[in-house]
Amino acid sequence: MLDVLNTINFLPLAELEVGQHFYWELGSFKIHGQILLTSWFVIALILLAAFISSLNVQRIPSGMQNFMESVLEFIRSLTKDQIGEKDYRPWVPFIGTLFLFIFVSNWSGALVPWKVIELPSGELAAPTSDINTTVALALLTSIAYFYAGISKKGLGYFAGYAEPVPFMVPFKIIEDFTKPLSLSFRLFGNILADELVVGVLVLLVPLFIPLPLMVLGLFLSAIQALIFATLAANYIGEALEEHGAEDHD
């Protein structure tokens, strides 16, 4: 029995590090360097796709131009549905940027072999698997819908907090704090959980990589990008909506 236990102790076990970061020091601040690296990679991919699609613009689109125009049409339709015909156009770039960054970030975690690249500490991963990234995106969304409401209604925007009765003011304030929290933690939790589950299974059964689970992860990653962009547009639409007006189409 002791011989069996000693043999087991020498067998290599699968390991997966969580919470290990590659820090960059900026003065007295420490920055998660690996997240900046992967974020720059994602941004570069999006810019490259936009550049290639605009190299030789045709009246009848094909190839990359056709793909990017389809993506733009999808984003425009999503923004219009949530904000409304009257006010949606200025917000298409913002919602589109959110959707594309989150979508490409999520997929990069599943398709790009980040763990092959060794760092002095920590490991590369999808930007959206870091809580700092998702909180930043959620705070940008909060700033956007406050800006939308105040730019259209002035300080009268906050009068909506007292509707339908003044008793609702504390609840409306709490709601404003919970919106970015729910956005950030939903995205962070889903992407991190997906990476951990796939990572553990790949380590445990390296000869039979769980491809079906990876495909499911790609689908769920796309859904998370859609949910975030849809909710962001919906919050902006609520801020722009006139008090007492009927729901926009």
From Swiss-Prot:
Q: How does it sit in the membrane?
A: Multi-pass membrane protein
What SUPFAM superfamilies does the annotation carry? Answer: F1F0 ATP synthase subunit A
Q: Tell me the keywords, alphabetical order.
A: ATP synthesis, CF(0), Hydrogen ion transport, Ion transport, Membrane, Thylakoid, Transmembrane, Transmembrane helix, Transport
Q: Which residues cross the membrane?
A: 35-55, 92-112, 131-151, 187-209, 221-241
**Gene Ontology annotations for the cellular component aspect, listed alphabetically:** plasma membrane-derived thylakoid membrane; proton-transporting ATP synthase complex
The record's section on InterPro entries has: ATP_syn_F0_a_bact/chloroplast, ATP_synth_F0_asu, ATP_synth_F0_asu_AS, F0_ATP_A_sf
Name the principal localization, coarsely classed.
Answer: membrane
Q: Which Gene3D superfamilies match?
A: ATP synthase, F0 complex, subunit A
Q: Which domain of life is it from?
A: Bacteria
Where it sits in the cell: the answer is: Cellular thylakoid membrane
Keyword presence, Protein transport: no
Listed GO MF terms: proton-transporting ATP synthase activity, rotational mechanism
Keyword Transmembrane helix assigned to the entry: answer is yes
What is known about what this protein does? Key component of the proton channel; it plays a direct role in the translocation of protons across the membrane.
Q: How does it assemble?
A: F-type ATPases have 2 components, CF(1) - the catalytic core - and CF(0) - the membrane proton channel. CF(1) has five subunits: alpha(3), beta(3), gamma(1), delta(1), epsilon(1). CF(0) has four main subunits: a, b, b' and c.
Q: Which family does it belong to?
A: Belongs to the ATPase A chain family.
UniProt xrefs under NCBIfam families? ATP_synt_6_or_A
Query: Which protein, by its recorded name, is this?
Result: ATP synthase subunit a
